[in-house]
A protein has these predicted regions:
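Protein-protein interaction and targeting regions used for scaffolding, dimerization, and localization
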Residues: 1-58
Length: 58
């Protein structure tokens, strides 16, 4: 898997996790050119997920 694909997967996985924990305040859906996101996103957790994917973490 190339770097872009790893980062995209990390973003999708983290946003999915945040969606499950948000009690309906965050929604994420596939859109024509990416994702459609509504609600609060924990940007620090998202950044850590991206950094972990680049560094080869889980």
């Amino acid at each position: 898997m190339d770097l872009e694909a790893q980062i995209a997967e990390a973003i999708r996985t983290e946003l999915s996790r945040q969606t499950e924990e948000s009690q309906g305040r965050l929604t994420v859906a596939d859109a024509d050119q990416g994702l459609e996101i509504h609600g609060p996103v924990d940007i620090e957790a998202l950044a850590m997920a991206i950094a972990g994917s680049v560094a080869g973490g889980p």
